[in-house]
Amino acid sequence: MVEAVKVSELVKDVPSLKIIEGKEYLSQKLIDTSDISRPGLELTGYFDFYPKNRIQLLGRTEISYSARLDHDLRERVFNKMATPETPCFIVSRGLPIPSEMLEAAEKEKIPVFSSNMATTHLSSVITQFLDEKLAPRKSIHGVLVEIYGMGVLIIGNSGVGKSETALDLVKRGHRLIADDRVDVYQKDDKTVVGEAPKILKHLMEIRGIGIIDVMNLFGAGAVKDSTEIQLIICLQNWDPKANYDRLGFNEKTREIFEVDVPQVTVPVKVGRNLAIIIEVAAMNFRAKKMGYDASQKFEQNLTELISDNSKKDEGESKK
């Protein structure tokens, strides 16, 4: 988990932010929460629960109210808002920035930004960026590919053929996100997202060949930066004694950051086309999400067949 994000990183990701004051402090100021403060009560002088460590975002309401205050009161208010813990001030909608805010920010070495975006939209963009940056993170050994728009994480023991299978899937028109190591973070209560570490982005290791650049070989359409992990495929070496699920009734899940992700175990055996099997597994999972379950259809057909045979047996016994 990233403990804090530099304000300079926020500026790079939200291009609508224009620096007005404190450019030299961008790398010094840190943001440790995705919550954003809209200092309304503070403008009236009420600071009992002022969240000083949050980004201070002022929109039309805050700026118009501050304009009604006299100079001395406005100066006192902005001096109290500007603390060493405050990451930055942002004024939306391209509104004029009070000179008292600029002076207070300069004293405490706080960057001040202006943006033409609407306040609510700007708040949403910043929150989304900070949620991703500050989210809990961990690395998983595996390969992440996007199959028909669905993120599929392929895991298994080293040497089982994860990268080779992913390469076959890329050749079939699907997209690589990460090979060997997948960095995973929790986006919300029901969503986990995977991406590649910067050093491994768009690269794959194929035994006997070495490192290959997937984007260079197959084009930009063969790669993607990140995707939601919706299905996990666990590759296992074939064990004749193992009892593999043949009908699809036993649905299993794997927990990632308290999010249960469906998992399918695929036994690896010479002659099995793993790429096609995984492709079909992804399509079958999507069909289940849309309400069609082939295993339930089979069970229904079997029940009807047994019922029909029972009726025939009853009819023959009466004769």
UniProtKB/Swiss-Prot annotation:
<comment type="similarity">
    <text>Belongs to the HPrK/P family.</text>
</comment>
<feature type="binding site">
    <location>
        <position position="163"/>
    </location>
    <ligand>
        <name>Mg(2+)</name>
    </ligand>
</feature>
<feature type="binding site">
    <location>
        <begin position="156"/>
        <end position="163"/>
    </location>
    <ligand>
        <name>ATP</name>
    </ligand>
</feature>
<dbReference type="InterPro" id="IPR027417">
    <property type="entry name" value="P-loop_NTPase"/>
</dbReference>
<feature type="active site" description="Proton acceptor; for phosphorylation activity. Proton donor; for dephosphorylation activity">
    <location>
        <position position="180"/>
    </location>
</feature>
<keyword id="KW-0067">ATP-binding</keyword>
<protein>
    <recommendedName>
        <fullName>HPr kinase/phosphorylase</fullName>
        <ecNumber>2.7.11.-</ecNumber>
        <ecNumber>2.7.4.-</ecNumber>
    </recommendedName>
</protein>
<keyword id="KW-0479">Metal-binding</keyword>
<dbReference type="Pfam" id="PF07475">
    <property type="entry name" value="Hpr_kinase_C"/>
</dbReference>
<keyword id="KW-0723">Serine/threonine-protein kinase</keyword>
<dbReference type="InterPro" id="IPR011126">
    <property type="entry name" value="Hpr_kin/Pase_Hpr_N"/>
</dbReference>
<dbReference type="GO" id="GO:0000155">
    <property type="term" value="F:phosphorelay sensor kinase activity"/>
</dbReference>
<dbReference type="InterPro" id="IPR011104">
    <property type="entry name" value="Hpr_kin/Pase_C"/>
</dbReference>
<comment type="function">
    <text>Catalyzes the ATP- as well as the pyrophosphate-dependent phosphorylation of a specific serine residue in HPr, a phosphocarrier protein of the phosphoenolpyruvate-dependent sugar phosphotransferase system (PTS). HprK/P also catalyzes the pyrophosphate-producing, inorganic phosphate-dependent dephosphorylation (phosphorolysis) of seryl-phosphorylated HPr (P-Ser-HPr).</text>
</comment>
<keyword id="KW-0511">Multifunctional enzyme</keyword>
<feature type="binding site">
    <location>
        <position position="205"/>
    </location>
    <ligand>
        <name>Mg(2+)</name>
    </ligand>
</feature>
<dbReference type="GO" id="GO:0004674">
    <property type="term" value="F:protein serine/threonine kinase activity"/>
</dbReference>
<dbReference type="GO" id="GO:0004712">
    <property type="term" value="F:protein serine/threonine/tyrosine kinase activity"/>
</dbReference>
<keyword id="KW-0460">Magnesium</keyword>
<feature type="region of interest" description="Important for the catalytic mechanism of both phosphorylation and dephosphorylation">
    <location>
        <begin position="204"/>
        <end position="213"/>
    </location>
</feature>
<dbReference type="GO" id="GO:0000287">
    <property type="term" value="F:magnesium ion binding"/>
</dbReference>
<dbReference type="InterPro" id="IPR003755">
    <property type="entry name" value="HPr(Ser)_kin/Pase"/>
</dbReference>
<comment type="subunit">
    <text>Homohexamer.</text>
</comment>
<dbReference type="GO" id="GO:0006109">
    <property type="term" value="P:regulation of carbohydrate metabolic process"/>
</dbReference>
<dbReference type="Pfam" id="PF02603">
    <property type="entry name" value="Hpr_kinase_N"/>
</dbReference>
<feature type="region of interest" description="Important for the catalytic mechanism of dephosphorylation">
    <location>
        <begin position="267"/>
        <end position="272"/>
    </location>
</feature>
<dbReference type="GO" id="GO:0005524">
    <property type="term" value="F:ATP binding"/>
</dbReference>
<keyword id="KW-0119">Carbohydrate metabolism</keyword>
<keyword id="KW-0418">Kinase</keyword>
<feature type="active site">
    <location>
        <position position="162"/>
    </location>
</feature>
<feature type="active site">
    <location>
        <position position="141"/>
    </location>
</feature>
<dbReference type="InterPro" id="IPR028979">
    <property type="entry name" value="Ser_kin/Pase_Hpr-like_N_sf"/>
</dbReference>
<keyword id="KW-0547">Nucleotide-binding</keyword>
<feature type="active site">
    <location>
        <position position="246"/>
    </location>
</feature>
<keyword id="KW-0808">Transferase</keyword>
